[in-house]
Amino acid sequence: VPIQKVQDDTKTLIKTVITRINDISHTQSVSSKQKVTGLDFIPGLHPILTLSKMDQTLAVYQQILTSMPSRNVIQISNDLENLRDLLHVLAFSKSCHLPWASGLETLDRLGGVLEASGYSTEVVALSRLQRSLQDMLWQLDLSPGC
């Protein structure tokens, strides 16, 4: 498979996930930069410049989304899995060794936050995920390093 096709597929999937997030209407109600106490473990406030950082970020979001009780996020979580696979193919094409990122070390914190404020966590996570995906889309055009 030509690597340009993989890169195009990656961008298309990113755009699809962004559209899915937009379709969940309540995600529009919070800024991705808004500071919400207890949710600082959710990435999305810093630029994502490398393929390994993209994979790590997606691993964290995937872990967060699969822990949420909401059914809205199941397809998005599946899409993130596929997106991570595509990033690994891109990394391999650049001779990058991309270890399979595992996400958050401490799920205890996540469980407590979800119990206390599941709705807020979902809104903030999806909003920041959307911002992170937009960053990734932009970075892919710049041919990111390992």
From Swiss-Prot:
Keyword field: Disulfide bond, Obesity, Secreted
Taxonomic superkingdom: Eukaryota
Any Pfam family matching the protein: Leptin
Keyword Magnesium attributed: no
Gene Ontology biological-process annotations: activation of protein kinase C activity; bone growth; cellular response to leptin stimulus; energy reserve metabolic process; intestinal absorption; leptin-mediated signaling pathway; lipid metabolic process; negative regulation of appetite by leptin-mediated signaling pathway
InterPro entries membership: 4_helix_cytokine-like_core, Leptin
KW Disulfide bond (keyword) present: yes
The protein's name in its UniProt record: Leptin
Source species: Pongo pygmaeus (Bornean orangutan)
Designated gene of the protein: LEP
